[in-house]
């Protein structure tokens, strides 16, 4: 009897939740949209046979990229979120009734994240672009053991699955931004984008001067619907109860709101590009695209076309090359924090290209670039320095000063946090003449072992700077591990980051 009552209560919850989610369609709950992340503008070919290669790429793009209009108004986006919520809720309710009729006791998460619902969510996010895709990208850098595996599958699938604008919508955007005669400003402009991402798509083009460029075009309506889209997404994620409380979803959403608005400001991104171009102009390992201001607006950025290949798609790269790439990206990450106090925080590996001809790493997508306050940088450098020294007392005190801990946590929570901090410092510890082998590292696994306890017992969200900073660090660590790289982390840390404590 008790079991049946529990089953009926669960089904009632499913039914009520699906009705709650449908209220979005009636405008009773506000919604939100937007973001940017770029799925890189790269070319593999050399100049010889350029026309044939590019024609071949056009055909490949037609096969791999889907076209669909971007919902531009707040009402239309609200409707799409509402229909998604209703569809997921009703599908879950129907499946729940079917399972109970068979004598099974399905869990809430298994009903929400059924195969059909995973497909439904992925397809809708790809059509919506904007916030839906960006939140997916942000959360996808959480460890897969933190999130339900079905949700992690959705997030992984949506990372690079945006549809692109149909031709008519594209031409309307270009005419609005560059004028009715916009086509005369280019000697070439590929109609099919090289890539389509969360807030925009990228087209190969050529200026009348012969300069090869890429044109990054923001989807219409994405910027204006950030707040409403985020509100809708927050409601969906909260109603589904899919995320652990320790993720502090409201803080994650607030951070995403800020970053999305940054990334939708293409003039801001253009300034970030120019800043990094100046910072790295004499760096032998890096190259940054040059911005063409006369072809750049609030919603379009035109920049030089990088000729490298995504680092994870390098054909038969030697281990020496992989070590070179990994070590220099790690160096840049440390310099961004300690020296520049200004970081490109997007961890997407497709932001890094390697040019075999110039032997340089080409950097892309600066929409998520941000400054860090001097006080935060000072304390964070001290924290990691204590970690490399295995100084538990110093690491704990600095964690409280930074706001990671309140001091009121259980001893097990304090110990788990300090253990994780000291583990994070491990690659940067030891002999400066020795490299750290990421291929056999267990740092991620050991930090992962504390995640469950920390999610359950965390009393406060981490400082807002941490969301983007640790996302970048996590992405770089994973990159080095995927490359199987050996990196002189201790040497880099001592030269760039260490603070005398």
From Swiss-Prot:
Pathway: Cofactor biosynthesis; ubiquinone biosynthesis
Effect of residue 137 to E: Abolishes coenzyme Q biosynthesis
Motif (KxGQ motif): 134-137
Main location group: mitochondrion
Official protein name in the record: Atypical kinase COQ8, mitochondrial
Phenotype for residue 475 to N: In coq8-8; impairs growth on ethanol and/or glycerol as a carbon source, but retains steady-state levels of COQ8
Organism field: Saccharomyces cerevisiae (strain ATCC 204508 / S288c)
Lineage: Eukaryota, Fungi, Dikarya, Ascomycota, Saccharomycotina
Keywords: ATP-binding, Kinase, Membrane, Mitochondrion, Mitochondrion inner membrane, Nucleotide-binding, Transferase, Transit peptide, Ubiquinone biosynthesis
GO function terms (MF aspect): ATP binding; ATP hydrolysis activity; kinase activity; lipid binding; protein kinase activity
Subcellular localization: Mitochondrion inner membrane
């Amino acid at each position: 009897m008790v079991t049946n009552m529990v089953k009926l209560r669960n089904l009632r919850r499913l039914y009520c939740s699906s009705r709650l989610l449908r209220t979005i369609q009636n405008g009773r709950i506000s919604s939100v949209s937007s973001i940017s992340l770029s799925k890189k503008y790269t070319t593999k070919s050399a100049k010889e046979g350029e026309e044939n290669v590019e024609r071949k790429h056009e055909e490949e793009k037609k096969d791999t990229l889907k076209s669909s209009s971007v919902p531009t108004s707040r009402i239309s986006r609200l409707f799409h979120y509402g229909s998604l919520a209703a569809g997921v809720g009703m599908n879950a309710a129907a499946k729940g009734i079917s399972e109970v009729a068979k004598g099974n006791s399905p869990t809430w998460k298994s009903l929400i994240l059924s195969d059909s619902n995973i497909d439904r969510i992925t397809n809708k996010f790809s059509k919506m672009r904007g916030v839906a895709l960006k939140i997916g990208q942000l959360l996808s850098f959480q460890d897969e053991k933190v999130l339900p595996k079905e949700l992690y599958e959705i997030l992984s699938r949506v990372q690079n699955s945006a549809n692109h604008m149909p031709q008519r919508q594209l031409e309307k955007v270009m005419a609005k931004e560059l004028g009715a005669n916009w086509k005369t400003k280019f000697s070439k402009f590929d109609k099919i984008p090289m890539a389509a991402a969360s807030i925009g798509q990228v087209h190969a083009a050529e200026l009348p001067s012969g300069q090869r460029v890429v044109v990054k075009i923001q989807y219409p309506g994405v910027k204006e619907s950030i707040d409403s889209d985020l509100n809708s997404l927050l409601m969906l994620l909260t109603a589904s109860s899919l995320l652990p409380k320790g993720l502090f979803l409201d803080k994650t959403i607030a951070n995403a709101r800020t970053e999305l608005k940054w990334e939708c400001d293409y003039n801001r991104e253009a300034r970030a590009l120019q800043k990094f171009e100046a910072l790295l102009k004499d760096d032998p390992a890096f190259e940054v695209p040059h911005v063409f201001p006369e072809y750049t607006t609030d919603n379009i950025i035109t920049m030089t076309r990088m000729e490298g290949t995504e680092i994870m798609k390098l054909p038969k790269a030697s281990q020496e090359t992989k070590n070179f790439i990994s070590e220099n990206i790690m160096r840049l990450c440390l310099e961004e924090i300690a020296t520049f106090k200004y970081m490109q925080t997007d961890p997407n590996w497709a932001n890094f290209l390697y040019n075999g001809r110039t032997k340089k790493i080409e950097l892309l997508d600066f929409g998520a670039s941000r400054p860090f306050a001097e006080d935060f940088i000072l304390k964070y450098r001290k924290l990691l320095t204590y970690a490399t020294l295995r100084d538990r007392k110093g690491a704990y005190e600095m964690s409280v000063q930074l706001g990671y801990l309140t001091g009121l946590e259980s001893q097990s929570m304090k110990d788990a946090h300090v253990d994780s901090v000291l583990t994070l410092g491990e690659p940067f510890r030891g002999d400066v003449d020795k490299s750290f082998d990421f291929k056999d590292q267990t740092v991620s696994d050991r930090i992962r072992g504390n995640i469950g306890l920390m999610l359950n017992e965390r009393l406060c969200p981490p400082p807002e700077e941490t969301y983007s900073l640790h996302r970048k660090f996590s992405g770089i660590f994973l990159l080095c591990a995927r490359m199987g790289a050996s990196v002189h982390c201790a040497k880099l840390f001592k030269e760039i980051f260490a603070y005398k404590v």
